[in-house]
Amino acid sequence: MKSIFILVLGNTEVSLIPGISVAGATPELTKLTPPADAEYLFYEKPRIIDAIPVTPEGHPTPAIITKAARELANFPILVVRGGTYLAPLVPHVHISSAVGRDFRREPALPEFGEIVRMAKLLGEELNRTEIEELVIGESTPGGTTTAQAVLWAMGYDARTSSASPENPQSLKEQVIAEGFQRAGIERGQLKDNPLEALRQFGDPMMATVVGLALGFRKNVVLAGGTQMLAVSALLKALEEDMSRFMIATTKWVVRDKSATFIETAKEIGIITYAADLDFSKSEFKGLRDYENGYVKEGVGAGGATWLAIKAGFSPEEVSAKVEELYRRLMGMKSP
């Protein structure tokens, strides 16, 4: 089956709320994470910033997994700027430069209609090619909070994951409660109005992936963790046939006791795949800590691994390639 890997980049002001996102060394640096992730897939290191994105504790971006899988399986990557502060310095499709707003103060995405329309056009063009399957990953700091807000607005009793082992669930819930109060809604009130949930609480990545999936009528693999549950819930509410969709994530998301990944996927009615990578024997603490609940998923890591496995590589080979790439990065650091 001919597949293409699409990386959708998104930013939301929610990532600037202290304590919400560890998808960057500081809240301010989360603005650079999406373009830097995209660049790292094409270069030895990002160009927009002189290092790969890390958590505040220094754990490497999951883009390293996506890059490893691609080095093995050689699948094509298309970068799509759904809505970011900065454009990546790689060839990409521009959908919008709209950044999701802080939904505690105002609706998150007044531009959602235009973003969905533009992304749908791209999906329709891809549908005209011989490509039979889109594997869509994302890089969106703060996106698990917008995802949980959208899921709650639509009546799902979901808890999303986090790139930190200490999921800031109570902070997320406080932020969401303030957003619901501002919008004048209660949980579940928008279950029949998915686009209003997207407008009030979503982010440009979600709108872009929804549009792509509406335009491309063949198989779609949503390569992500709990953020892709929100996308799935939106697609289901838009009466899409869920049998052509699958979520591909990592075992670290599935194992996350602070989240409800499997339960919510079942409630939505979408099948899931979890990449069985193992970094426990890595020589690098930054990678070993993935086994302790750091990072977990992002940049389509689970979906990219799934593509490598479909191409005949084993999870062990992907893990070994990640190790090799991380060693190369460490070697580039000045002593």
Curated annotation (Swiss-Prot):
Question: Which Pfam family is one of this chain's hits?
Answer: DBI_PRT
Report the GO molecular function annotations.
Answer: nicotinate-nucleotide-dimethylbenzimidazole phosphoribosyltransferase activity
Check the record and name the SUPFAM superfamilies matching this protein. Nicotinate mononucleotide:5,6-dimethylbenzimidazole phosphoribosyltransferase (CobT) (SSF52733)
InterPro entries assigned to the protein according to its UniProt record, in alphabetical order: Nict_dMeBzImd_PRibTrfase, Nict_dMeBzImd_PRibTrfase_arc, Nict_dMeBzImd_PRibTrfase_sf
Q: Which HAMAP family match?
A: UPF0284 (MF_01086)
Q: Which family does it belong to?
A: Belongs to the UPF0284 family.
Stored PANTHER family: PTHR38811, UPF0284 PROTEIN SLL1500
The name on file for this protein is UPF0284 protein TK0853
Could you tell me which species this protein originates from? Thermococcus kodakarensis (strain ATCC BAA-918 / JCM 12380 / KOD1)
The lineage, from the top, is: Archaea, Methanobacteriati, Methanobacteriota, Thermococci, Thermococcales
